[in-house]
């Protein structure tokens, strides 16, 4: 693999995007433990991001089993940047501004659940930053 300034800059930008997304999630946290509510209590955007994340996890696992590391990493990158950060976090901001509402608490749960999942998928590729962020978040029981 050749060294590339462009790839280094892209990797730095991605790490920065991940760090800022985690800061946003942590800044809006009032929960101590992640417990996803029943599906009937989830907003449409929550169902969408959870479904998208589950598809991502299946894709990453399948690609890693086939030793398609680059394909797996590209899928995580695209999901994190384009889906989670650019869409879901933007959609979540309105609900997170509704302090003390059920929608706010559910949004915190989903935000934290998906971010924890992204960090687990990214950990083999970016162990130091993912460990630092993961250790600062609440988790599912037994995580």
Name each model feature, range by range:
Residues 1-143:
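Helix-rich, typically C-terminal accessory recognition domains appended to large enzymatic cores
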């Amino acid at each position: 693999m050749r060294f590339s300034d462009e790839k280094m800059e892209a990797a730095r930008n991605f790490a920065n995007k991940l760090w800022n997304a985690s800061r946003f999630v942590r800044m809006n946290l009032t929960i101590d433990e992640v417990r996803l509510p029943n599906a009937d209590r989830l907003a449409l955007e929550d169902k969408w991001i959870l479904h998208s994340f589950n598809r991502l996890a299946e894709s990453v696992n399948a690609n890693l089993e086939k030793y398609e590391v680059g394909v797996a990493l590209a899928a995580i990158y695209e999901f994190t940047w384009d889906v989670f950060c650019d869409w879901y976090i933007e959609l979540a901001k309105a609900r997170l501004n509704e302090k003390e509402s059920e929608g706010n608490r559910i949004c915190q749960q989903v935000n934290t659940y998906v971010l924890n999942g992204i960090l687990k998928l990214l950990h083999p590729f970016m162990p130091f930053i993912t460990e630092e962020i993961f250790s600062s978040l609440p988790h599912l029981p037994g995580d």
